[in-house]
Amino acid sequence: MPRKARIDAPGALHHVIIRGIEGRKIFRSDDDRMNFVDRLSELIPKTKTDCFAWSLLDNHAHFLFRTGSVPVAVLMSRLLTGYAGWFNRRYRRHGQLFQNRYKSILCQEDPYLKELVRYIHLNPLRARLVKTLEELDAYPWCGHGVLMSESTCAWQNVEYVYGLFSDY
């Protein structure tokens, strides 16, 4: 039976989630995470996608994207296919790395967007990868530190997110 087509349009907001097959790790080391981030830094501008939030955990990752003229499916296909091939060669393994297709949830601008930015960026804290907000500020595999000006990330759109929270 064919899969349902994903709904996408220029300017659509997507909460994208990728998971390792059978709950396995998709990132075993910081080198793995760096390779993935390097791929994002190349593909985000190329596909004219905005990334407002992101978080890499051991066995899954979350992103908040606004599509440009290129569908999110193109970005995700290039990202996940390239990374899975690299990962499989690196660890001398075969087969699927990711559980099914990535999950993509269309989001409304208000009021869900602010909560989603919080949810995605607090994931490492909930997963106990960091213990405090100060540690989260310095956690390099999440967009939170970029928003807190503790690190930089050229492909993360911080100005838009700052605008969402400007009334606080």
Predicted segments — roles?
Residues 1-58, 66-168:
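Short Pro-Cys-Gly-centered "Cys-loop" motif that presents a nucleophilic cysteine in a tight turn
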